[in-house]
Amino acid sequence: MADLLIELFSEEIPARMQAKAEADLLAALTGKLKEAGLAWKTAFAVSGPRRLTAVVEGLDARSADVREEKKGPKVGAPEQAIAGFLRGAGLTDISEASVVSDPKKGDFYVAYSTVPGRDAKDVIAEAVPAIIRDFHWPKSMRWGTGELRWVRPLQRIVCVLDGAVVPFEVGGITSGNETEGHRVHGRGPYTVTGWADYKSQLEGQGHVVLSRDDRRAAILGGIEKACAKAGLQWIEDKGLLEEVTGLAEWPVVVLGQMDPDFLDLPPEVITLSMRTHQKYFAATHAKTGKLAPNFILVANIAATDGGAKIAEGNARVLSARLSDARFFWEKDKATPLEVMGEKLKTIAFKEELGSLGDKVERVAALARELAPAVGADPGLAERAARLAKADLVSEMVGEFPELQGVMGRYYALAVGEDARVADAIRDHYKPQGPSDSVPTDPVSIAVALADKLDTLVGFWAIDEKPTGSKDPFALRRAALGVVRINLENGVRLKLSNAILKAPLAVRPVVKGGQSDSVRSAASKAIDALIDPTLLSFFADRLKQVLRDQGKRHDLIDAVFALGEDDLVLIVKRVEALAAFLATEDGATLLAGYRRAANILKAEEKKGALPDGLSVDPALIAKGPAAEQALWASLNETTAALEAPLKTEDFAGAMTALAGLRAPVDAFFEDVLVNDSDAKVRENRLALLIAVRGALHKVADFSRIEG
């Protein structure tokens, strides 16, 4: 057994690429070893700003010999067949082959050969250069006059097997056993013999924390210690934490202080400026929760003054950044949102759907239409929609696109707009992902729904729907947003009605003398709206939401098939249906339904089911008791369903359906549907149709699986 250490040492690797490169290196190396027939006990990899390291412990020193056999022709086969076999097997005479007997096939020739194993050293010397040459980076470069590509110039390659260098050369770099430590604290070089020695020297004299997990833990510990001492609470940012973990080999947390005067800027501006430009964490006062005039940086050096000069220098840089932000803030506040909004007319949204200004007009009209249904003031909803996109042309959003909507809210509040209007400007983009919250104020709900529905209807009108994994206009996210907004707020809105209001908002675009393509899209809007694929698209998103909650997708189909598109109502029906089917009555009635449905399906397939069949009570009265009992129960159930369905008492509706269970069972037990009397047969089929129809008042049971 042998131990292998490989290090690929380069200039700085972008932080975002390190984790994947670490995994890719390990996968490529173990893949090559496995392919060569070598086994090992453990294998792992680590990565950092300047190195990718892979370790394999307990590696076979040599792969096993492999015995191969090549089957040949039968004994006594023609000379031509035997000659071909000898050439293929590398034999000079047939006497070198073995004869194997098979009870069915008879005697035939077999050539055996042994492929000798290979030393691990030889396999590695061949595999590692190939891995380096074929390694995939999202972005790579060449340097000097060489042809080798790497993410940044590759400087050293360590390849040590059981303390000895595995010699090879790739891209002009010869493998060796020397590496470097921290640029300032322990550059080295260091001669290493294996993983234990490598780790000991680098994490000791070399001042390099090799593991990402260890660096992350060191950073978290440093942040918590610094904040506890200063009475602060850091604003957690997992994305930034991962990034700075990949920026420092020897992470040292430094707490800095900025000019408190900058706190008059919106906190989102300050924290985003820190994060985007400087990779700093922000902090709040632990007692008040308000943003503190502090920043937390992760240095790659342990300064002798405790980081005071580092903090001072970074404070100056941050001050310059925030001064720029203050300039944008003051300039934007001097421009009314209505004036900003005028510029949207010159910005294309989609050629066939006009400008962003056109979209704003449509959304404003649609928000007014939807407002009563969600309990919002129509005037406020329209006002918010007209201002919602204005900040897209602001200086601040130009610098920080992530602040779209957020800055619009601040600018609206600064001039005295209604707080509900301001909040809707910020929240109409929500939810922007599965973990994002949905708007909850009625005005925000109206504008958010209008914005998303306008986008969906527009792209359906121009036939640009998502296909496969491609969704360049984030239509799935928009539809999912509509679903979540409705469900999480209990909004009672029929999607078909809401969608059909969209053309009312599209028509003003046509009146505005827009291009032929815009008029064409508007004229197609009605057809697009009644396209069943749009409602099906929403159904798929609803399934996604409910599936994440552990609910069955087939029950959603069963309810949606009735033409129901009030999402809140669908969920209530699905929950009641799931509870009913979990009972013995529900499961048995479903089995009875399927039996009836199969009989009817077979008759329909044969064309033996006349149109307009209806039950003749007189014939029922002459039939068996079980038939009469089912007819009576069906009438009772149909009557009993009316009240609970009208009041949306779906549990009550299921209770009413349960009354059919025993009569349906008895009917199939005692009654022959396919009676010799044609009229009796048709009447019994009509009875089954009536049973099916009663169940379909609650859900399409044919869509239920299992």
Swiss-Prot record:
GO molecular function: arginine-tRNA ligase activity; ATP binding; glycine-tRNA ligase activity
Recorded catalytic activity of this chain's protein: tRNA(Gly) + glycine + ATP = glycyl-tRNA(Gly) + AMP + diphosphate
Paired cysteines (S-S): none
Keyword terms: Aminoacyl-tRNA synthetase, ATP-binding, Cytoplasm, Ligase, Nucleotide-binding, Protein biosynthesis
GO cellular component, one term: cytosol
Cellular localisation: Cytoplasm
Major location category of this protein: cytoplasm
EC number(s) given by UniProt: 6.1.1.14
UniProt superkingdom: Bacteria
Gene Ontology biological-process annotations: arginyl-tRNA aminoacylation; glycyl-tRNA aminoacylation
The protein's assembly and partners: Tetramer of two alpha and two beta subunits.
Family: Belongs to the class-II aminoacyl-tRNA synthetase family.
Protein name, as recorded: Glycine--tRNA ligase beta subunit
Gene label: glyS
